[in-house]
Amino acid sequence: MVLGSSQSSAKELTTQSSIFRFLVLLLCFTSATGGQINGKLLNGNGVFVSRDELQNKNVLGVITGFDLLVVATHSRFQVFENNEERRTVGHVSLDMHPRTKFLELKLFSKSEIFYCDESSCGLCTYSGVTSSCSTFMLNGDEPKIQEILSSSAVKIENLGQIMLAISFKNEEDPDNPRTMILRYNAQDTGTVIPTAYHADSSFIHNNHALTGFEREGFVYFVMTASQIFEPEVFLHDQSNNKVTVTKVIRFCATDQTADLASKISILVGCDQEFRNISSRGETAVYDHANDLINIVMFNHTSMNHLMCRFKMANIEKRFKTIWSTCQETSFSGSTAKTTRCKYPQIFDQMKVKKGCLTYSRLDDESSPTLCVRYGRGDALDNCQLHTAKSNSYRYGWLEDYNVLQGELMMRIPYPFFGIAESLITDGKSYFAAVSGEFDMSDVLRFSASESADIRPHWRTNISVVGKFSITKTKENQLLYTTVEGLQSLDISCKGLYPNCQTLRQGGWEDPLECSWCADDNAQRTITSSEVSSCKNNLKHECPPSMRWIHKYNNNSGFTAVVDGFRALKNPKLNACGTNCVVTVVDSSSIQCDTNPDEVIGDSCKQVFLSGMIGDKNYSFPFDYQQADRGTQTDVKNSQVDDKKGSSPGWKIAIAIISVMTIILIVAIIVYYMRNRFPRIKTHVRPPIGQRIENEYDMGHMAGRQAQLAINGDNYVKVFRSMRPDLKVDFKNLRVDKLDPIGQGHYGVVYKAMYSPSKSLEEKVVCKYLKEGKISEFYEEARTMSEFDHPNILKLIGVALDDSSHLPIIITEYMAKGDLKSFIENVENTIKMRDLFEFAFDIAKGMNYMHSKKFIHRDLACRNCLLDEHLRVKIADFGLCRKVDIETELYVQMHERDLPVRWFPPEISEQGFGITSDIWSFGVVIWELFTRGSTPYSNMASWILILPWLKESETNRLRKPPYCPEKLYTDVMLACWKANPAERPQFSDLVTIIPNVVKYMEGYDRSQLQAGYERVSSRFLSLSRHDPAFPIYQNEMPNTPLLANCQNDTNDSKTLAELPSDSPSTSTAIPQSTPYQLLSECSETSV
């Protein structure tokens, strides 16, 4: 009984213990979901996640400060310790109104979080799980805020007040966003009413608040806006010119006026080369440690992003100078000041006169008022305006148009990224969250070269891009948003560059000074401090990697395919002590032979590849697997087999008999097929040298109806399988089949009218399938559906002819036809500027296409079309293919005729790639500036062209007569570099081409507006040094591409600044104001 009782008690105890453990686990789970558990914020994949909302796409931002880390989701702020433990210290529950982003998110203290979303702003405090939030009233009756677009908040610590800058859509005028600056008492409950506010003038639009901070008794905001250029209004009493400016705004922290009259704004920039006022600020960060402001802005004149750095000491000095200068002029002297500044009415003279570029927002009128002393009485300090004896003549709210020049840190060519949303400094490097043109969001790490050019180092995708997508922790980790939550990354050589390939993509130049250790069994990324412990340290080169290695079946040598082989000089192979002499070397493989008396046995399992990298010899071991052996015959060493007594005669006889048997079988099959299917016609296209045709040329039509009898049902089946959004009802089309207008790779083209609804009708083009190439025909349509760009032909849809069941591709109608025919036509008056516009349009379209990882493979003037406004659109995608994302190459699977006169010589060995289109683009520009001549017209075929191009890099198409030397050398010859890696990308070309135009405008603008004659074929065969060769008379080849900033003049224009009589209406390059920045190129103090 005792024993039984004991056992019973043990069971009860075990049951109770299990229940207790279950309750403990349940309590832990409940605490975890409530955000109270002191657990880590790190999952098994090294991803920081939001515990309070399991769907991690709800993570909208992350910030750090006061030794805390705050993760913001749609409905909660989760607060953690900013250390390795990441323990939860509290959370704030927000109201449940829908929000998609935070426009401001800032820690004011260890217990205060300020936020703004699209509709409201508030201040929250927390203590563990207890929290409260206030709502900041943004307006009374006026203005009526429809949506907040940007915001920045600053807490004035010693006063317990908050200043808030917001830009917003006004319900009454939503197309012109406005700005307000408001001041509040810091309050974390209820509704907080502003104690003062300032609304910007109505002529200032598209405002955006970038950042804000407090410094030495003043509050600063960095903002950007579009506004009327007030100096011109002042001179001429009217102006329609608007400028886009970036400005720093200062308020006195102790300003007690109801409308914040201490406000002063100064314009800032650092565009020494292009000194026009036309810069849109995108993101800014104040570096407290170094007392600097870093601003990323987009310059509309240079078409580049710029990173500018400003010393706060210089900014503050400018503010003091502006205020003191305005206080020097009394009210009685204002008329004389106006006369002195306004006459003569010449801007260049006015800008050098003291105080003539600072205006007061005395009221909300668009007429600018020169600043004079505030309040009409004695001169006041900027922070004492509330003591003014009179409420009249309150000349505050100053704005100075003398642009303060900062230090140019970096030029970032467009479109390296679209818009910079946020910026983090990391020593000599930077992290930025950026958005692209095609809904692509990335985090970048980059630094500046000595010449202020960007050096990209590292890049990764993020799920949501915004002001708070990235942050840096105390442990020198980068946190960024992903679809999983928050990804953590060590900011170190090993964290950023885990393998040599990532180093090669930009890590070599990282200021972290990373390199690759290629030691046996210890290959890794190392820092400069670890170099001494590495025997095989590599910098700027990666060790080769063996993809496979095959041994000859007579054991006399190897063939090896090696990645990264070009880095190795004087390569050698050694197999188990046996030297294998390298006999054949190409771009990615080597072959080697052993001595006749040496044989590599089957027991050998390792091969060493050695050679020079830089000035040091390296040796890399590779395992030789049994499965790789005996797969190749060494023809060179057949004599070795003779010495060993083998007789190859019978092998040769068998080979001959086998080949003859195969030929006989193929002949029988061909004979059978030709008699079995007599109606199937094989269409052979003419050689490429004879087929210089455009997409709208009429082609061969015979045999079509017979082909339909075989494939009609297949067409219907394939059409039904197409995506619904691509299908067009044939009943909505009226096709003019009596007048075909041309032929593409897979179809015949007709004009048509498309009526998707009763009230809408538009001209379109219908391309009908020819000769049964159904898969390639629909592939062209699928490819076109991937594109949406103003310089690429738009796909309307795909239809099926009701009567013939022929598939149809429907595209937009291009009124001016193909580019080749247009430039060939001598009746068309074409100016040199038009040719530049055509080239620029094509470059933009190709830049977009390459960003989508497609290559065109048939880029030529005949495949570019012109709309009624002479905008070029790239067409004919019959050869367009998706490239491999890693190699950026496309492997040709089927032989067919190709436009080889537009192709680079390397395609015969390496296949098609991104750089193939770059070469073709150079030929397209040559076509443009010869007005449609045929490339290599004196050579009959590719057999002659290919060896001529390979023989020397000087063997290239000659510079067309009348073509500017700078265009030929900087663009055409650059596109025709023998090494594909040295060719510019289209992302470079969209900047280079406008710069060539600016260069030309510097010495002969009239030439751009002159008619450009068609080049006679006789001149194309002449040497450039031949006396009969026509020349561009005003060529100045020794003039630098961009003038020095000290010699810059008001004559600098952009490509888009076309005279009214120009036939082109392209607005691809934005207009810029003719007004220059008013200070010198270096950073100025006043």
Curated annotation (Swiss-Prot):
Q: Cite the residue spans of the region called Disordered.
A: 1056-1086
State the tissue distribution: Expressed in body wall and vulva muscles, pharynx, intestine, excretory canals, distal tip cells and some neurons. Expressed in D-type motor neurons upon axon injury.
Q: Does the record's keyword annotation contain Magnesium? A: no
The Protein kinase domain extends over: 735-996
A single Gene Ontology biological process assigned to it is: positive regulation of MAPK cascade
Give the Enzyme Commission number.
2.7.10.1
Full protein name: Tyrosine-protein kinase receptor svh-2
Specify the taxonomic lineage: Eukaryota, Metazoa, Ecdysozoa, Nematoda, Chromadorea
